[in-house]
């Protein structure tokens, strides 16, 4: 019994540490982060995208944060970053309702900078178009040091608040795991008792 408890405790400790570390790495990253979103972004990955400085999406891309459907709470700083980037209405749809947010919806609210018109099987074309856009917009005509200094100034007011929000999310997730709620939701999905929107 004690050995199983130790394994569970270690698993939870790793969950907390890894979640805090990866989220912190994204919202404190000093360089310009560009995301080329050429398909679905789900869960923690979707949350972390919100910390990108520029996001380019394919028309078929979408965000899905099924935290509430799985008995979890928001993670990856999404409870703050989504509100900032999507606006409160779309953030509520994404986080509370576990609603899929399409590329067009993301463009309308300013979550993405541009939709690159390519098909689902045109990954190479999509990447080439994103790289061309980045080179055109962030190329040699701009001073690299100024870019990162301006980013630091833009992000400075939210850093301390994000530290607290990320800890609150991780502790909320830990409480849910300890109570067994997500495990029960995953069991229902595995047994066909519950359909999921993925």
Language-model segments: which ranges?
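Glycine- (often His-adjacent) and acidic-residue-rich active-site loop
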Residues: 1-22, 41, 71
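Glycine-rich phosphate-binding loop at the start of an alpha helix
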Residues: 13-20, 43, 76, 100, ...
């Amino acid at each position: 019994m004690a050995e199983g408890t130790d394994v569970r405790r270690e698993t939870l400790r790793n969950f907390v540490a890894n979640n805090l570390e990866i989220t912190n790495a994204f919202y404190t990253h000093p360089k310009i982060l560009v995301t080329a979103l050429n398909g679905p972004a789900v869960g923690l990955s979707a949350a972390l995208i919100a910390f990108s400085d520029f996001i380019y999406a394919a028309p078929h891309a979408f965000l899905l944060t099924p935290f509430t459907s799985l008995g979890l709470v928001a993670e990856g700083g999404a409870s703050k970053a989504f509100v900032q980037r999507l606006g409160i209405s779309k953030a509520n749809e994404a986080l509370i309702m576990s609603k899929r947010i399409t590329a067009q919806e993301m463009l309308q609210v300013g979550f993405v900078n541009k939709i690159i018109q390519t098909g689902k099987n045109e990954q190479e074309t999509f990447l080439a178009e994103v790289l061309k856009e980045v080179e055109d917009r962030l190329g040699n005509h701009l001073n690299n040091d100024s870019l990162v200094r301006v980013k630091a100034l833009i992000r400075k007011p939210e850093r301390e608040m994000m530290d607290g929000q990320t800890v609150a999310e991780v502790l909320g997730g830990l409480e849910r795991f300890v109570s067994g709620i997500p495990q029960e939701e995953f069991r229902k999905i595995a047994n066909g008792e519950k359909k999921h929107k993925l």
